[in-house]
Every structure is written in structure tokens, then in C-alpha cells.
């Protein structure tokens, strides 16, 4: 009898475990044994790699080895002063890499070629392209933001996206992309991460981070997950001040650290440490995680077992810039590469002086320099690269690129609500009213596609409509059996008075061709029945796909990546 009770008890526990896991979120990981990332794992026994690294090390002075640990930012401009700055950091300070930011891709390529020509050791060219090249460079493909991509259920598409971004980076001579953002954005008031995150579910964020990063690295570009140990639940911008993460270790393990652990276990090669105060890990008040040995060496390297390249976040940011000898502190904390120092001459000299005083050993500098060189070899930098300038725009903006952008946009469309099964609409109903909340021509692709199924009658909602005009418009709409509200306007305050009294006795379908956070600006819920579709953008192909979804000739598989107030929870979606 006791055995029967025991079996019953075990059975109940087995049933409850998935429920408990779903409620509590990701379970903490146990420490994992360190292992080199996939990108360099085979190089430990590669004779040619070792010979190349040895040959470079032999000809570098101590100061030049220190220089290899710096990445300096350069504007992609062709003016004389900018070119002289480029020459100085490459020839005088022997930096290990460059970060270009903003401008035209043609200028970036010309400066990249010039810098590589001047460099004694090939430069690691880095880029901050969280949603592709368009984040920084004009005339490049504009992919959706991460929070939109977080709605996509097919992670193979995210991997494909990573491969494509890697291809474009290589076309520009870029070997490192400071992406993806691995922060779990569970604070809707976050002023800096927000749509840069894949969402608020640690599971979903982790899956997207791994898929995208693998795509990058399989395409020959180092991924750098950021901002360790997690910048998602803050209401302070680390560009302006030092955010505090006042959480327990158990909370950090289950939410903030979860995507980073998954990235490490997947064998991904780069991590960026953010400027964050984490009292439960580093008790020294005001010390940023990027300068904390307990965070970098203790948590990231020893506890989580990360053996890849550790980058600081930009050292010119306000979240860290008040500290003395920033670069020296960052190296002592365990970082490998120092990103965007304010005063490179003074910082290089400070590190050199510290080595001579014994605060850092030559052995530590040598180990970091060898590590950087090994990654350079893995990224094809054993020889100086040269980027072909002619045909650059055509190579970046290809038909395959445009097709991928289309598929990503369509896969993110999410039916948030379908109360009383309003959708799909029945074509036999006849005319439908279409209320256009935006510019007159903005929804023409939608209307054209809609006309394949029904006869749409368009009404345009003016801003700050007088009460009498609003009543007439509401009465006109009420004559139709179905109303489609198409929203392309981002600033919706001028329309709120109209919707406050919008309660028709017929079904209404709200179509938001704007970012999800704008949905709450319009009152919904008072119609006889409702459906809500979040399309994220007014892209022409997206508009056509939404029309197909409305009439059931296409389906939507998207799921909301981050809650929209209390109206729609993360994970919401109807197929």
C-alpha cells in the first residue's frame, strides 16, 4: 500500500513540475565546465594558427600588445581631420580594432581599406548593428526591430536573418557585430533597451539570441551578446547614469542571466558587459559591472564558464565615465577588449604604467593579446583584407535580402484578439467600412488587396474632430455590418475623443500598422465584437497580407513578444 501511495505522489509531482516551471520562469543553471566557443575550439590544435599568433607576438612590444586590446571609434567621414585621427590610432597606438558608426557605407569601406593598409596587424573591424546595417548606415536594408522579431515563432527565420546580416557585414569588411541584445525587457518604462530586446520572456529571448548569433557566426562574423548581466529591467539609461539591478541572485539566474547562459552553452563567441550596478554580486557601491572583477571574472568567466572574448560596453558612457583609470580597471576585472575609451593616449599609458608597477603582469597582457589574435585568425584576419568598393550597394541590397525582409515582416503579424470569432470575415456580407486613421494614401495597398474580397468604403478620421462631425461619422459607420479601423498614425492623441464614444453594435476589426506600444492610445472593447491585428508596420506587403488574413486566405502565427499594458499579455496571439 505504501508503494502505491509513493507512486501516486511521484506521479502528481511529475504533473506539477511543468506547471511550476511555467509559473516560476526559467530554473537556475548549475555552473558549467569552461569550454572554448565553437568559433575557435578547433584552433587550439591548429599549427598554422599557433605559428601566426607566435609570429605576431614576437614582433609586438609591450605597449603594442596593450594597444591590441583597444577598439577605437571612427566616424566614416573623408575629411582631413578624421583621416589624421584614423592614422594616429592605427599607426601610433596600434589599436586592435575600430568601430565605425553612422554615415555612408561607401565612406566606411574606403576608411576600412585605408586603415587595414596602415595597420601592422590586421584590424578587427566592429559594428553596432542590432537590427542590421541600417541601424548605423544609410542606404542599407532596414530589418524589423528585435521586439517585432520576437513575435516570430519560427526561429529558423531568425537564424537565416543572422546569416544575412553576417553576409552584409563581410561585404563591408566587418568581422564583429555587437549584437544581439540578450536583455529581457520586462520593464515597460525602460528608456534605452525597449524595442532593442526580443521581448519579456527569458525563454523566447534566449531562443532568438542563440538562433541569431549562430547565424552570424556561421556566416563568419563574431556575435557579441549584450548587455551582461542584463539591462532589461531598468528605468535608467546607462548612457546617462548608472542603473541599479536590485535583485537577488535567484531572480538574476531565472530572468536576466538566462539568455546569456543559453548563449554560452550554445558555444557563442562574444559577450559585452554593461555598465550596471549589481549589489548582489558586487557589494561595492557605485562600481559598474564592467569594472567589477566579481561580475566579469567571477560570474561570467568562472561561474558561467564563458571562455570567449569579453568586450566592455562603450567606456565613454556616463554609466562608467566617472571612474579613474577606466581601462586599467576593466582589464583587471577580466575584460579582454576595451571599447571606445575617451582618451586613448592616457589610457594606454595608464595600463603600461600599471604593468611596470606590478598591478597587472606582462603575462596577463600576453594572454589577452594572444586571445585577441586567435579570434582574429578565426575571423580570417591572418592576412590583410581588402573590400571591393565597386558594386557595393548592389551586393548589399539583393533580391534575396528583400525577400527575407518580407518573410520576417509577414511572420511577425499577430492576431491579438478575435472575440466572438469575428475573423475571418465572410465575403458574402458585402460592403465593409474602412476607417482610415492616418494619411490619405497610406493604406492604399491594403484597400487594393481588400477589393479582391469585398467592396471597401473608406472613411478618413480627421484630427481633433468637432463633436458634431464625430457623431455624424460614427452614425455613418454604424450603417455597415463590419468596420475595419486601419491605424497608420503614430501619434494618436488627436483621435482619442472620437474613440472614447465609439461603441458600434456591429463587429469591429482594429488593424494596427504601427508598433505595439501605440495600441493603448486608442480605446477598444466597446464594440459588439472585436478583433485586433498587430501588423507592426505599414510596409506594402504587410498591408496586403493583413487583408488576406482578414478574409482567411492567409493565417497569422505571430505571438506577442512583450505585454501591451494590461490589455494584451506577452504570448498573446490567435492563429
Model-derived regions, located:
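Preference for extracellular/luminal or secreted protein segments
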Residues: 22-72, 76-89, 302, 323-575
Amino acid at each position: 500500500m505504501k508503494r502505491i501511495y509513493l507512486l501516486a505522489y511521484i506521479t502528481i509531482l511529475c504533473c506539477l513540475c511543468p506547471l511550476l516551471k511555467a509559473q516560476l520562469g526559467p530554473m537556475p543553471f548549475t555552473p558549467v565546465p569552461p569550454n572554448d566557443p565553437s568559433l575557435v575550439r578547433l584552433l587550439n590544435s591548429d599549427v598554422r594558427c599557433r605559428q601566426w599568433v607566435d609570429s605576431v607576438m614576437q614582433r609586438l612590444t609591450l605597449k603594442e600588445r596593450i594597444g591590441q586590446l583597444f577598439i577605437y571609434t571612427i566616424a566614416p567621414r573623408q575629411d582631413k581631420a578624421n583621416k589624421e585621427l584614423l592614422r594616429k590610432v592605427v599607426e601610433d597606438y596600434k589599436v586592435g580594432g575600430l568601430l565605425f558608426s553612422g554615415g555612408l557605407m561607401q565612406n566606411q569601406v574606403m576608411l576600412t581599406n585605408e586603415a587595414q593598409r596602415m595597420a601592422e596587424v590586421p584590424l578587427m573591424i566592429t559594428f553596432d548593428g542590432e537590427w542590421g546595417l541600417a541601424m548605423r548606415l544609410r542606404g542599407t536594408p532596414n530589418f524589423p526591430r528585435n521586439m517585432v522579431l520576437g513575435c516570430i515563432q519560427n526561429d529558423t527565420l531568425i537564424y537565416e536573418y543572422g546569416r544575412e546580416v553576417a553576409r552584409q557585414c563581410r561585404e563591408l569588411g566587418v568581422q564583429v557585430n555587437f549584437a544581439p541584445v540578450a536583455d529581457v525587457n520586462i520593464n515597460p518604462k525602460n528608456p534605452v533597451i525597449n524595442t532593442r530586446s526580443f521581448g519579456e520572456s527569458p525563454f523566447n529571448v534566449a531562443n532568438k539570441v542563440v538562433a541569431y548569433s549562430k547565424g552570424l557566426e556561421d556566416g563568419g562574423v563574431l556575435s557579441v551578446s549584450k548587455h551582461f548581466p542584463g539591462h532589461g529591467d531598468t528605468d535608467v539609461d546607462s548612457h546617462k547614469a548608472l542603473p541599479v539591478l536590485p535583485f537577488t541572485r535567484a531572480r538574476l539566474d531565472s530572468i536576466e542571466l538566462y539568455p546569456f547562459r543559453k548563449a554560452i552553452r550554445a558555444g557563442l563567441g562574444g559577450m559585452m558587459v554593461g555598465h550596471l550596478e549589481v549589489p548582489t554580486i558586487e557589494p561595492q557601491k557605485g562600481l559598474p559591472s564592467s569594472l567589477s572583477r566579481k561580475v566579469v571574472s567571477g560570474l561570467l568567466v568562472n561561474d558561467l564558464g564563458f571562455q570567449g572574448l569579453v568586450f566592455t560596453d562603450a567606456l565613454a558612457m556616463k554609466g562608467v565615465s566617472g571612474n579613474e583609470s577606466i581601462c586599467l580597471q576593466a582589464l583587471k576585472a577580466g575584460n579582454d577588449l576595451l571599447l571606445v575609451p575617451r582618451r586613448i593616449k592616457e589610457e594606454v599609458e595608464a595600463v603600461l604604467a600599471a604593468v611596470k608597477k606590478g598591478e597587472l603582469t606582462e603575462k596577463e597582457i600576453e594572454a589577452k593579446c594572444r586571445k585577441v589574435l586567435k579570434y582574429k585568425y578565426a575571423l580570417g584576419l591572418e592576412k590583410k583584407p581588402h573590400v571591393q568598393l565597386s558594386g557595393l550597394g548592389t551586393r548589399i541590397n539583393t533580391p534575396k535580402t528583400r525577400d527575407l525582409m518580407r518573410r520576417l515582416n509577414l511572420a511577425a503579424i499577430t492576431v491579438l484578439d478575435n472575440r466572438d470569432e469575428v475573423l475571418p470575415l465572410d465575403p458574402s456580407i458585402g460592403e465593409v467600412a474602412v476607417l482610415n486613421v492616418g494619411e490619405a494614401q497610406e493604406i492604399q495597398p491594403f484597400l487594393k488587396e481588400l477589393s479582391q474580397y469585398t467592396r471597401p468604403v473608406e472613411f478618413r478620421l480627421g484630427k481633433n474632430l468637432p463633436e458634431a462631425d464625430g457623431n455624424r461619422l460614427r452614425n455613418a459607420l454604424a450603417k455597415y455590418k463590419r468596420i475595419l479601423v486601419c491605424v497608420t498614425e503614430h501619434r494618436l492623441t488627436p483621435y482619442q475623443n472620437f474613440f472614447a464614444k465609439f461603441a458600434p453594435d456591429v463587429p469591429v476589426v482594429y488593424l494596427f500598422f504601427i508598433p505595439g506600444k501605440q495600441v493603448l492610445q486608442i480605446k477598444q472593447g466597446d464594440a459588439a465584437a472585436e478583433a485586433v491585428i498587430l501588423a507592426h508596420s505599414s510596409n506594402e506587403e504587410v498591408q496586403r497580407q493583413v487583408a488576406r488574413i482578414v478574409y482567411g486566405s492567409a493565417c497569422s502565427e505571430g505571438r506577442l513578444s512583450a505585454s501591451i499594458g494590461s490589455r494584451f499579455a506577452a504570448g498573446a496571439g490567435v492563429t
